[in-house]
């Protein structure tokens, strides 16, 4: 009987739930990924660079994809999933962090990022579970909401 080796490429990414208070409510920076239908909202995230720490990746990707700078508050957790890319199965781990807005104007991003991001918008954190397209990201937003309810920021 032949023996087959099942191998899977692994990817490690990091992203952020970047929050701020506007008019008395917590809002988060959401992106509409390039090429997706209107109404598909996601969190900024991307591959961890060689020698880069996941928290630094979350801050960098948030700035690249939204135009804002933030500070790291806490790690929210990891999501894991498998997807297929060009016929190859990929096991992906995405570490998410709670980030606090510090400066910048949402949506002011470099022209080359327009391929990846069609739009960035502040959306109510309370509504994140209804607005975000991906289940794991909804869970991270729920953790962010629980954190801001239980802690003084």
Regions found by a protein language model. Name each.
Residues 2-43:
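N-terminal strand-loop-strand
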Residues 48-139:
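Unchanged
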Residues 143-151:
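C-terminal alpha-helix
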């Amino acid at each position: 009987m032949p023996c087959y080796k099942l191998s899977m490429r692994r990817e490690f990414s990091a992203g952020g739930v970047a929050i701020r208070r506007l008019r008395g409510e917590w809002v988060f920076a959401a992106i509409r990924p390039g090429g997706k239908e209107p109404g598909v909202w996601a969190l900024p995230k991307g591959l961890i660079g060689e020698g880069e720490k996941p928290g630094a990746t979350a801050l960098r990707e948030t700035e690249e994809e939204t135009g804002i700078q933030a500070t790291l508050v806490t790690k929210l957790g990891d999501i894991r999933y498998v997807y297929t890319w060009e016929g190859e199965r990929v096991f992906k781990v995405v570490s998410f962090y709670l980030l606090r807005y510090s400066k910048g104007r949402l949506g002011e991003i470099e022209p080359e990022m327009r391929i990846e991001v069609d739009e960035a918008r502040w959306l109510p954190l309370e509504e994140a579970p209804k607005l975000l397209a991906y289940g794991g990201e909804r869970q991270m937003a729920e953790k962010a909401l629980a954190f801001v309810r239980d802690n003084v920021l």
